[in-house]
């Protein structure tokens, strides 16, 4: 069967194709117009008439209608054939005006033609643009008579201009040619020229025009001038109306009425022909009505009879429905189906395969060909015709197990739904039912000869939704039900299906049991209407006798209905209603209406007491009546169930990895011993009884690796079994049993035991030993660690066919291989041929592909499959026969490289697969065809080649673990399953050894190898650069192209398959390699015969850590590390040491006591700071560790009290409805925020379209960021990665942290910060949204003076400040209260508008809004607010801050503004907008403004940084308390480097620091230096500091002041000087005596000390400050002696100030 791409153009009919394109080009010429009156009148007719008939009757109105808009616009909006409703919606204006008062008709003549113009009357309104040369004729003519010349014009020209004649002309001539010539809607001039051309020299004056006045207007009639004349040019109908009211046109159709009837008859004929296809039988009127209720028509003229015609019609109709669901060009396997029914399914010309197995005796005469035993299905789709009820779910599951290609099974079944409840037939005119114990009889239309007998349990098919065995599922879906006939489709896998199946239920009820004698109650069902009528009747008579009930029953039941009941049923029915008549219908309960207060209190007590009495004494008469009338309505609807066939031992799943064996446990008994067991004496045994047994039920799976590999057992549950278990235990004396040499002879082995014995004990199996001996390999495996690798694995039971014996066949059999019968899948053949026809082949043309498909004939061929590792010698023993008998062998390879390899070894007939296909057209293949490396052939190609050469025998050779082939983009073959899935089950075992790879590499891949590496040569190595001396394998085509710029010998992982190299370099990418398939990675690792070099693009000490998640590479990483550990260590040369330079500083010694007192001056006691809760007591946030640390709050998850306080304070709750109402109420505020934001940052821009490339890039960026996390973090988030984790659920917890904010230091504890964790997919989606909007904002923002502190460094911010910040006036900063909780519905609306402006896809926006509305925690749904765990938290916080500030303040265009989350800074004073005062109360967000004078100690701060003229610097106070707390806690090792980097900007200011910081801040800066200095003096053993020169001891520092080391040397110089000054102030005079020639060199020039002394003198005039700095008298004396040693060149002022 040939498949064609539906998008491919028609190839053969070139003429039709050109005409079609010409027709499309002419469509744009149409320009017609329609008046408002025309539009009004169009509404008077039905849509069906307008679409089908109007163009043949009065096409003027229809054609004019399309003219009211521009042709291109109308075509795009309406389409080529618009419906009436669509035209009215698109084109009818909202207001209508009178035609008479606004328009007039004017007829004019031109040089060529005469035109009728519709002009606007004086003073009339202009309704539409009416072209002068197009509006021919008018619906309402204002003239009572037409002048002669005008009449002549109307007679001669109008019939050909108004569209009617044009359409008639097209009907009478070739429709296609007329359309091509004129286009679908021609201009009037074009049509006139066409008419003149076709009727040259013809008399056009054979018609005349008559006018008729009616209440609806004036009409123009075209009639023949001489009715008896035979010279009519055009066969125009008499009294044809041109224009006018369409309702009148319909009434006066004239001869066209017959035309409509003829068209109706044509439609009826077509419908009858369709009905006759599946229902050619005659039926009674009741049967016809029943069939019509199921949508099955009947032929009124049918005379053919059938014993059960109606049932046969339903069966045929269901086959017609099935045929519509089957793919026409696919080959289907028909099971239990007659060939003569193929036309009912529309498959008469299809090459379907019919397989009919004998299920019952009548099948012997039903089918022309049949078989015994259910065969396998070779196609992907199969159909079972009305035989599913003969099969059990087990047999259906086995059919799928035996048929690996089978994916979809269509099946019809005949099971009446009434059998679920054993009710009588609901369709007695179609079938009747009888029940016998556990069986029922289905009698179609009362014909006993066509009856069926089934078991009642077969009705379970109606309720089965899935069939399960272990972890495998089949899904059963009901597609259609017609009476008792059902259409099911069964597919592989577990997919969603209906939880309830609804069947047509009768309007019947079952009566309640009212008598104690069960046999006296009514057991049959009654018609619901009949029961209601009887109940009303018996209660309507005052006196009722039993005879009256019997008479009424006979009156209401027809003769046919009476036959459905037995006499006993009728008697029981009469008694039921007679009993019902004598029950009371009066409610004796006390009424509530009108009762007083006292009665309303007492009445419930009375009612309660009466209910208690009824429980003991019986119900009242009224309640008896109500209970008797509680009839049960019969309903056949069923809840679907999963049919589980799993045995207890099948609960264990076996997973196959690498070369390891996988199997299911067998249900058979233990193997029977064929040799008598050795007798052993046993002592008396004691037994213990258990009442319950625990049976393990797997939760995820159990990964079994056989043999000798660890078995990771996942979480499991245990079910209790009530069967008692007796465990016996007794000692056994040492008695040595006899040991059989061959276990296969001593035991009868069934099921999986044979496989396990072959795996565990291969040395005891003669067959395995023989195979290994023939291949010349050792019978022993290799032990790697705790694992045993065997030379042969993956045993399967394969039944070989007996064929003729020759030397080659015997050689295969000696090695354990043989030929099996394989039938190529016809669908794969068709797909391969279709791909070749559409240009997927390089050497094969489309004509050759078509010829190949015609010649292909899928038939069974003999096939031998050999699977093994690369280098196992699969082709070695074949090469000898190929070389000795070249005429008997044909070798086909997927690559030219393999072809050359075969030719080098002496093979003659070797071809690539495309060449082999072309040769098959001229010459068949030889007796044996070898398909080498078959996994690289395109999918379906092997089946196509086998179908062309059916007489050859095939040897299929390959490796099941290497990569599969993938066809070009757009090929149909990409949808097919790989060939390895079809041929792997035909191989008896897997050759698990290799002679190519060295033993360490082979063992790492799970193979046995006896090739030892060469001594002194590395096997595995790691490099950061791409080598040039070997082949490089890259994980993607992009990386391959990049590698080719360095090394032209580059391949992808899979493109190198089939080739081997002495040395291979494998490029490892952190993000790409880990997502490569196992087969691709295995292919790359198995290409080398020697060394493998891993080239890593992952930087850092954790190289390869994340790649360990990839199979195979995990083992190789360990090998690489072992190899590196075994290499000799190369000792690095010691560095030369130089003398220390004299250090420089500008900071004095500061007392630590003073700094701590300054920090703690406002602190309070611990329990005065803690929060107290009555239920949980105090919080535990104050940790008494050190004097600074105890003032810093410690928030941790274990603090339950603080956790609840945080949830109460930070998280607010609401319902989803309240959140929706919040969004609706705040929508206007959101628009205001967006308007101000857009004006400030998108001035003059319009919304943009989505940038798909950027969106994909952002998604990839988010994914890469997520995968860059450590493996521990990735595994820690498994719960949120699960699809079972609700996308709106939030896992919330308290963030564990030290709160080192200066504003919270030493103050009472406040609520902590929550961390909210969404489902990972939700974070990825919203993160993509945020990243896309971030990139688009950076691209489109029109404000050059705004700075967003994201993806920027402190140096970037400092550069921005220096380039434009204005320090001449005051600056503005702000502080927001509850910033996250205040972002309500107004900000969500702002975010939605912002996203729409940037072109974000609608579904992504809707998903984000849903997360804001529906997110919930364990407490309930969260109200609309900002949450910390959202993907766009930072960006949306920043934009919310920007929008609010732009709404509240007037921000000048020249103002420099900086934003980061809720932080804000501006270099100008901002004024509040007057309009904001009215809006302020409607915003939850409250913001306070602060002004900074931008002088010393009063600069604007932003994100913990101070904005100064010299750039930005860190706040020294915050730095000191953070450093000191780290020092006290003991975590300074990890933090010292970061704080050192923060101090560098302060250090680099030099003396300028005094102009930026006040006195207190300067002292805190000196305190930071002191902490760093003391840490370095103690020395650092932290592993992260080993390579940093900063943390070496001062005397071992290598002082080379180079460009890159200047910053490091600076801090060392400061530290050394601090040490010298400290010794000096403590009175250690030896420091100066030991260095008599050394003077302190201060920063800058020699009078730097003078500057410092003068500056300190101005700031510290009080003696208290000097006492704190120089707190020892010895220190003062030492300082005076030091100043005395200054140079004599300094003046007295310097000396005096130095003394100070």
UniProtKB/Swiss-Prot annotation:
PROSITE patterns: ALPHAVIRUS_MT, PSRV_HELICASE. Residues 299-462 form the Alphavirus-like MT domain. Keywords: ATP-binding, Helicase, Hydrolase, Multifunctional enzyme, Nucleotide-binding, Nucleotidyltransferase, RNA-directed RNA polymerase, Transferase, Viral RNA replication. The keyword Transferase applies. Residues 992-1128 form the (+)RNA virus helicase C-terminal domain. GO terms for molecular function: ATP binding; ATP hydrolysis activity; mRNA methyltransferase activity; RNA binding; RNA helicase activity; RNA-directed RNA polymerase activity. Residues 1369-1480 form the RdRp catalytic domain. One of its GO terms (biological process) is mRNA modification. Coiled coil: none annotated. Its EC number is 2.7.7.48, 3.6.4.13. The keyword Nucleotide-binding applies. RNA replication. The protein possibly functions as an ATP-binding helicase. Belongs to the potexvirus/carlavirus RNA replication protein family. This is RNA replication protein. It comes from Sclerotinia sclerotiorum debilitation-associated virus (isolate Sclerotinia/China/Xie/-) (SsDRV).
């Amino acid at each position: 069967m040939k498949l064609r791409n539906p998008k491919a153009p028609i190839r053969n009919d070139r003429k039709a194709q050109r005409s079609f394109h010409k027709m499309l080009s002419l469509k744009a010429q149409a320009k017609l117009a329609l008046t408002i009156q025309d539009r009004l009148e169009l509404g008077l007719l039905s849509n069906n008439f307008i679409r089908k008939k109007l163009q043949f009757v009065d096409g003027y109105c229809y054609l004019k209608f399309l003219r009211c808009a521009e042709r291109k616009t109308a075509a795009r909006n309406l389409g080529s054939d618009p419906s009436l409703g669509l035209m009215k919606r698109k084109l009818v204006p909202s207001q209508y005006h009178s035609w008479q008062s606004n328009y007039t008709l004017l007829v004019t003549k031109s040089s060529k033609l005469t035109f009728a113009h519709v002009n606007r009357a004086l003073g009339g309104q202009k309704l539409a643009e009416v072209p002068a040369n197009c509006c021919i004729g008018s619906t309402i003519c204002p003239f009572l008579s037409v002048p002669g010349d005008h009449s002549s014009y109307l007679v001669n020209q109008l019939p050909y201009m108004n569209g009617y004649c044009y359409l008639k002309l097209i009907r009478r001539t070739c429709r296609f040619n007329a359309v091509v010539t004129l286009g679908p809607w021609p201009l009037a001039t074009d049509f006139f020229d066409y008419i003149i051309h076709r009727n040259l020299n013809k008399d056009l004056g054979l018609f005349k025009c008559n006018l008729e006045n009616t209440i609806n207007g004036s009409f123009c009639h075209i009639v023949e001038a001489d009715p008896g004349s035979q010279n009519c040019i055009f066969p125009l109908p008499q009294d044809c109306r041109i224009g006018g009211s369409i309702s009148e046109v319909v009434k006066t159709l004239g001869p066209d009425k017959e035309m409509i009837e003829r068209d109706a008859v044509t439609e009826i004929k077509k419908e009858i022909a369709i009905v006759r296809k599946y229902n050619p039988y005659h039926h009674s009127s009741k049967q016809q009505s029943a069939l019509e209720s199921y949508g099955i028509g009947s032929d009124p003229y049918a005379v053919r009879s059938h014993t059960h015609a109606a049932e046969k019609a339903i069966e045929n109709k269901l086959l017609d429905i099935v045929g519509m669901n089957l793919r026409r060009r696919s080959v289907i396997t028909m099971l239990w189906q007659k060939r003569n029914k193929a036309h009912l399914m529309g498959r008469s010309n299809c090459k379907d395969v019919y397989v009919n197995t004998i299920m019952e005796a009548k099948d012997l005469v039903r089918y022309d060909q049949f078989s015994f035993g259910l065969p396998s299905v070779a196609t992907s789709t199969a159909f079972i015709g009305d035989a599913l009820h003969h099969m059990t779910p087990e047999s259906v599951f086995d059919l799928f197990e035996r048929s690996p290609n089978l994916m979809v099974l269509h099946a019809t079944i005949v099971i009446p739904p009434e059998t679920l409840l054993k009710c009588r037939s609901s369709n007695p005119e179609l079938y009747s039912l009888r029940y016998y114990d556990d069986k029922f009889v289905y009698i179609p239309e009362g014909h006993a000869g066509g009856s069926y007998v089934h078991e009642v349990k077969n009705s379970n098919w109606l309720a089965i939704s899935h069939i399960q065995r272990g972890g495998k599922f089949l899904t059963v879906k009901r597609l259609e039900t017609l009476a008792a006939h059902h259409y099911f489709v069964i597919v592989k896998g577990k997919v969603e299906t209906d939880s309830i199946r609804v069947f047509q239920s009768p309007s019947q009820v079952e009566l309640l049991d009212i008598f104690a004698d069960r046999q006296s109650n009514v057991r049959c069902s009654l018609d619901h209407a009949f029961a209601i009528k009887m109940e009303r009747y018996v209660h309507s008579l005052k006196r009722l006798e039993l005879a009256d009930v019997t008479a009424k029953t006979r009156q209401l039941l027809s003769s046919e209905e009476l036959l459905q009941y037995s006499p006993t049923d009728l008697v029981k029915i009469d008694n039921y209603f007679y009993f019902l008549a004598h029950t009371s219908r009066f409610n004796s309960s006390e009424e509530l209406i009108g009762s007083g207060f006292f009665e309303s209190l007492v009445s419930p007590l009375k009612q309660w007491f009466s209910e208690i009495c009824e429980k003991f004494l019986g119900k009242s008469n009224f309640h008896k009546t109500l209970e008797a009338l509680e009839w049960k309505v019969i309903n056949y609807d069923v809840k679907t169930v999963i049919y589980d066939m799993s045995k207890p031992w099948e609960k264990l799943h076996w997973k196959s990895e690498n070369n390891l064996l996988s199997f299911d446990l067998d249900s058979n008994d233990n193997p029977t011993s064929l040799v008598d067991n050795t007798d052993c004496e046993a002592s008396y045994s004691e037994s213990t009884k258990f009442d319950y047994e625990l049976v393990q039920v797997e939760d995820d799976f159990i990964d079994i690796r056989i043999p000798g590999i660890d078995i990771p057992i996942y979480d499991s549950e245990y079910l209790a079994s009530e069967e008692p278990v007796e465990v016996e235990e007794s000692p056994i004396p040492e008695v040595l049993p006899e040991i059989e040499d061959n276990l296969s002879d001593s035991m009868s082995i069934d099921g999986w035991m044979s496989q396990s014995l072959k795996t565990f004990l291969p040395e005891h199996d003669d067959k395995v030993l023989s195979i290994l001996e023939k291949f010349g390999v050792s019978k022993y495996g290799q032990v790697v660690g705790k694992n045993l690798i065997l030379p042969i694995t993956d045993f399967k039971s394969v039944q070989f066919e007996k064929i003729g014996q020759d030397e080659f066949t015997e050689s295969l059999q000696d090695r354990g291989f043989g030929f099996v019968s394989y039938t190529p899948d016809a669908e794969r053949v068709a797909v391969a041929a279709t791909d070749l026809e559409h240009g997927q082949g390089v050497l094969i043309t489309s004509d050759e592909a078509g010829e190949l498909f015609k010649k292909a004939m899928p038939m069974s061929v003999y096939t031998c499959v050999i699977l093994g590792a690369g280098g196992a010698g699969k082709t070695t023993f074949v090469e000898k026969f190929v070389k000795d008998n070249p005429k008997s062998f044909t070798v086909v390879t997927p690559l030219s490289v393999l072809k050359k390899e075969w030719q080098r070894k002496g093979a003659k007939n070797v071809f690539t697969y495309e060449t082999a296909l072309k040769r098959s057209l001229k010459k068949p293949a030889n007796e044996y065809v070898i398909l080498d490396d078959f996994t690289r052939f395109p999918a379906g190609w092997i089946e196509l080649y086998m179908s062309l050469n059916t007489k050859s025998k095939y040897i299929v050779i390959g490796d099941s673990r290497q990569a599969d082939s993938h066809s070009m983009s757009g090929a149909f073959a990409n949808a097919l399953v790989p060939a390895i899935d079809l041929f792997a089950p035909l191989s008896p075992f897997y050759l698990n050894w290799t002679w190519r790879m060295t033993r360490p590499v082979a063992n790492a891949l799970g193979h046995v190898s006896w090739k030892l590496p060469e001594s002194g040569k590395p096997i595995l190595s790691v490099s950061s650069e791409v080598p040039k001396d070997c082949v490089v394998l890259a994980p993607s085509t992009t990386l391959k192209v990049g590698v080719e710029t360095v090394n032209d010998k580059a391949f992808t992982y899979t493109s190198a398959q089939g080739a081997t190299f002495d040395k291979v370099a494998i490029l490892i990418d952190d993000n790409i390699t880990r997502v490569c398939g196992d087969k691709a990675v295995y292919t790359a690792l198995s290409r080398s015969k020697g060394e493998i070099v891993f080239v890593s693009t992952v930087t850092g000490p954790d190289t390869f850590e994340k790649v360990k998640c990839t199979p195979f590479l995990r083992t190789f990483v360990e090998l690489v590390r072992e190899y590196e550990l075994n290499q000799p260590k190369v000792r690095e040369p010691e560095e030369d040491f130089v003398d220390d330079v004299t250090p420089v500083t500008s900071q004095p010694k500061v007392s630590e006591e003073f700094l701590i007192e300054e920090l703690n001056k406002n602190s309070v006691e611990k329990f005065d700071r803690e929060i107290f809760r009555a239920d949980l007591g105090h919080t535990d946030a104050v940790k008494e560790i050190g004097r600074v640390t105890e003032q810093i709050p410690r928030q941790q998850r274990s603090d339950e009290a603080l956790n609840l306080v945080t949830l109460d304070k930070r998280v607010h709750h609401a319902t989803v409805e309240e959140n929706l109402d919040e969004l609706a109420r705040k929508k206007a505020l959101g628009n205001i925020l967006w308007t101000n934001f857009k004006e400030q940052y998108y001035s003059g821009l319009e919304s943009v379209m989505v940038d798909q490339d950027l969106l994909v890039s952002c998604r990839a960026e988010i994914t890469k960021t997520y995968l860059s996390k450590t493996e521990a973090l990735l595994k820690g988030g498994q719960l949120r990665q699960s699809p079972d984790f609700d996308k709106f659920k939030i896992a919330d917890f308290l963030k564990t942290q030290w709160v080192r904010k200066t504003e919270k230091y030493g103050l009472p504890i406040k609520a902590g910060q929550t961390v909210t964790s969404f489902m990972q997919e939700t974070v990825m989606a919203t993160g993509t949204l945020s990243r896309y909007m971030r990139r688009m904002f950076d691209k489109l923002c029109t404000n050059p003076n705004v700075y967003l502190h994201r993806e920027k460094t402190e140096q970037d911010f400092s550069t921005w400040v220096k380039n434009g910040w204005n320090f001449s006036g005051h600056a503005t900063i702000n502080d927001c209260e509850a910033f996250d909780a205040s972002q309500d519905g107004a900000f969500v609306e702002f975010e939605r508008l912002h996203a729409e402006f940037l072109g974000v896809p609608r579904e992504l926006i809707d998903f984000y809004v849903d997360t804001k509305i529906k997110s919930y925690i364990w407490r309930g749904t969260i109200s609309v607010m900002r949450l910390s765990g959202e993907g766009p938290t930072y960006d949306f916080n920043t934009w919310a801050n920007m929008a609010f500030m732009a709404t509240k303040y007037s921000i000048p265009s020249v103002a420099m503004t900086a934003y980061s989350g809720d932080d804000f800074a501006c270099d100008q004073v901002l004024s509040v907008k007057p309009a904001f005062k009215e809006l302020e109360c409607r915003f939850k967000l409250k913001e306070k403004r602060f002004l900074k004078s931008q002088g010393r100690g009063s600069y604007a701060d932003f994100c913990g940084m101070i904005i100064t003229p010299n750039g930005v610097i860190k706040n020294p106070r915050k730095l000191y308390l953070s450093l000191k707390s780290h020092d006290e806690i003991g975590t300074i090792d990890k933090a010292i480097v970061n704080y050192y980097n923060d101090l560098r900007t302060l250090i680099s200011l030099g003396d300028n620091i005094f102009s930026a910081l006040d006195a207190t801040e300067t002292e805190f800066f000196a305190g930071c230096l002191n902490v760093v200095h003391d840490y370095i003096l103690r020395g650092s053993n932290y592993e992260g500091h080993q390579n940093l020169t900063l943390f070496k001891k001062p005397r071992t520092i290598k002082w080379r002041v180079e460009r890159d080391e200047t910053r490091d040397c600076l801090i060392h110089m400061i530290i050394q000087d601090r040490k010298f000054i400290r010794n000096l102030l403590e009175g250690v005079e030896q420091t100066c005596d030991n260095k008599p020639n050394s003077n302190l060199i201060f920063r800058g020039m020699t009078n730097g000390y003078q500057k410092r002394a003068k500056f300190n003198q101005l700031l510290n005039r009080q003696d208290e400050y000097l006492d704190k700095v120089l707190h020892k008298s010895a220190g003062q004396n030492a300082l005076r002696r030091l100043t005395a040693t200054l140079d004599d060149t300094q003046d007295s002022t310097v000396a005096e100030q130095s003394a100070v």
